C-alpha cells in the first residue's frame, strides 16, 4: 500500500521544521508534553480539490503549524521584562524561521508538491497540563497536482 500524499507532505513539513535551531521539539499531532520549548505541532486541517484537466486534478493540503511556548516563570530568564513579552518574542522568531524555511524551498524538496502558499498566522493562548502557553498557528497550504488517468 502506498503512503497517502497528505502523509508524505506532513513528513516533509516535520523534517523541515525539525531542522530549525529555534525549535526544540516537533510533534506529529496536537499532543504536547514538556520535552522541549518552543514546541511545534503539525496537524492536518483540510483538503481541497479542484478540476484541472481531464488527466489531472489540483489538490490543496492544509496543515496547522501550531507554535507554543509556556508563560510560566520557570521558562523566562531573570533579565527579561515580562513573561508574555518574552513568550511572544520567542514565538515570533519561530514563526519567522518556519516561514523562511518554507519560502526558501517552496516545493519542499520536490516530489508531489508544486508549491506552498504564503502562510497566515493566528495568535492564541492555550491551556495545557503545565499551565498556560502563548501560541501562534501558522496555516500552511500545500498545492499539488494529481494525475487521475
Predicted regions and their residues:
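Charged, amphipathic alpha-helical segments and their flanking helix caps
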Residues: 1-34, 46-149
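A short glycine-rich, His/Asp/Glu-containing loop-to-beta-strand
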Residues: 37-42
Amino acid at each position: 500500500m502506498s503512503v497517502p500524499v497528505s502523509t508524505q507532505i506532513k513528513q516533509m513539513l516535520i523534517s523541515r521544521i525539525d531542522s530549525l535551531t529555534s525549535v526544540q521539539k516537533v510533534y506529529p499531532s496536537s499532543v504536547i508534553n514538556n520535552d522541549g520549548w518552543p514546541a511545534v505541532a503539525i496537524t492536518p486541517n483540510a483538503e481541497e480539490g479542484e478540476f484541472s484537466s481531464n488527466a489531472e486534478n489540483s489538490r490543496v493540503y492544509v496543515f496547522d503549524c501550531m507554535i507554543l511556548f509556556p508563560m510560566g516563570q520557570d521558562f523566562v530568564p531573570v533579565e527579561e521584562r515580562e513573561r508574555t513579552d518574552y513568550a511572544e518574542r520567542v514565538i515570533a522568531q519561530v514563526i519567522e524561521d518556519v516561514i523562511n524555511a518554507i519560502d526558501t524551498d517552496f516545493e519542499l524538496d520536490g516530489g508531489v508538491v508544486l508549491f506552498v502558499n504564503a502562510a497566515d498566522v493566528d495568535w492564541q493562548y492555550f491551556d495545557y497540563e503545565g499551565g498556560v502557553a502563548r501560541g501562534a498557528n501558522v496555516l500552511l497550504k500545500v498545492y499539488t497536482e494529481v494525475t487521475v488517468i
